[in-house]
Amino acid sequence: MKSLSVIFKPKSSPAKIYFPADRQASPDESHFISLIHACKDTASLRHVHAQILRRGVLSSRVAAQLVSCSSLLKSPDYSLSIFRNSEERNPFVLNALIRGLTENARFESSVRHFILMLRLGVKPDRLTFPFVLKSNSKLGFRWLGRALHAATLKNFVDCDSFVRLSLVDMYAKTGQLKHAFQVFEESPDRIKKESILIWNVLINGYCRAKDMHMATTLFRSMPERNSGSWSTLIKGYVDSGELNRAKQLFELMPEKNVVSWTTLINGFSQTGDYETAISTYFEMLEKGLKPNEYTIAAVLSACSKSGALGSGIRIHGYILDNGIKLDRAIGTALVDMYAKCGELDCAATVFSNMNHKDILSWTAMIQGWAVHGRFHQAIQCFRQMMYSGEKPDEVVFLAVLTACLNSSEVDLGLNFFDSMRLDYAIEPTLKHYVLVVDLLGRAGKLNEAHELVENMPINPDLTTWAALYRACKAHKGYRRAESVSQNLLELDPELCGSYIFLDKTHASKGNIQDVEKRRLSLQKRIKERSLGWSYIELDGQLNKFSAGDYSHKLTQEIGLKLDEIISLAIQKGYNPGADWSIHDIEEEEKENVTGIHSEKLALTLGFLRTAPGTTIRIIKNLRICGDCHSLMKYVSKISQRDILLRDARQFHHFKDGRCSCGDYW
């Protein structure tokens, strides 16, 4: 496995590229079309366009080629400019324009120019409809879809196989499966072996609608299947949460390709089976298949979520060894993986090596700095993004507000929050409000936090009230906490956390009898409580623990070692469960309850399997509890080890008995 030092060694300077000077062009139409095809950027195309205008050879063919080329160069505005300044209004030019607008995601403009085509009296043909139908499938206008279908009949192109395929796809994607099936049924080609594509499109439509029975029925009825047929149905099962069925179908697949492997890897990652997602990726490599950018992004996502740094480094090494381009998708996935595995410097290095960054890339880096409490770097990165011309969206503001929250930068956080609406016309979501409530609460501004919750334009949810409750508890605002707890109960009286909040509130005031009443109510009404899990990667293998998990092969050794760790911590002042559990449980019961949290089990395995001085890295799906947080601090001081724990909210870097969060999380 490559080390980080090998992966991040300095690169040699790239070779300079020299472009030959422009050559004189003849006024021949075919010659200019050849020049248009040779253009690699918009500047070159503009140069050729200027010569065409000077020499007066802007025919319909040349105009259509100019529009097509500018679309391929991702310059739809230039395509529109060419069209507006050209007198050509024929099917060649309009088809090229509609196609280019569709391929550049200008769907509304594509439909508008189709309508303009009809108004100009230009007859649409079989090359027009597939792209305007695709645009409408993205827009989702059912009435327009039916009107376009009628137009295909009127213009006698409804029997064209490509038009029919586009109709089925459009109806399926706009949720009109009855119409999609009707067009499919009327297709005489569906019984031919070469009609696989229309079958795949319809099966995909039923998969998107979660109608796996109909999708499977169609799959079994196909005259012939290709890898796309298998991959479509596998993805349908994955998206429907039927991962076992997806795996069974994958095993039956005669020729597995990178698409089917990627679908399966992505499915395991999305359903939280990160170990299997990662192992499936390496199994694919052993079979001799080369991953594409989607495969790599999917497996890196699994590494990010589980903290599998070792596997992530191996994947990064594979990318370098095989000369895979560090595009936006792979680069962003690597940045996210390194940041979420606690290797911020590596994330920053990958980020700086990316030649092209989009909003997702910037957000991943800003969020990485933010969750590690690196406020100044997060804000600097945000400003660099603004200087680059990238416009912020609501997600990047979540990252910026997280940075302000984790560093208690109240005034700046409020400025960013106000700037969303005033400067960028972005309406804050519930998540933004929760962060601001947390920000005000952490600073002890309980009145302002409560007022914000009461006056929010969005109805506050449990998370919002819980953020306010934590602030009340931290700043001893018990009377306000009582009121907040009532709001929690009104929202969801059966939620276990609501009762626990009340218990803690009353226990802090010493009202033990009322606590007992609340606890009895809890026992009667609670149905289910989410269990926490933690991951720790050791020797390239992920180890997962759930709360109270005794399934690990080293369970006995872990239990003995955990007792030893807790005993040493108690000698140094650790008080198991104090101020964190319900007040009137016996001390030994408290230790039994709090001693089985998943992060404690992961920590203990880390001590058993790593050398002294090694940093222990743990990933937890829930917010770390106060008791475990306290133990981690004591253990980091006793063992002289760094403990890096990522919970549902942020990173906790325990070192010498202290935590980077400042004991507020």
UniProtKB/Swiss-Prot annotation:
Pfam families, sorted: DYW_deaminase, PPR, PPR_2
UniProt KW keywords: Repeat
PANTHER family given in the database record: DYW DOMAIN-CONTAINING PROTEIN, PENTATRICOPEPTIDE REPEAT-CONTAINING PROTEIN
Residue numbers spanned by region Type E motif: 464-539
Region span, Type DYW motif: 571-665
GO biological process: RNA modification
Family that this chain belongs to: Belongs to the PPR family. PCMP-H subfamily.
Sequence segments annotated as region (Type E(+) motif): 540-570
One GO molecular-function entry: zinc ion binding
Name under which the protein is recorded: Pentatricopeptide repeat-containing protein At1g04840
Species this chain originates from: Arabidopsis thaliana (Mouse-ear cress)
PPR repeat coordinates: 90-124, 125-155, 160-190, 195-229, 230-256, 257-291, 292-326, 327-357, 358-392, 393-423, 429-459
Disulfide bond sites: none
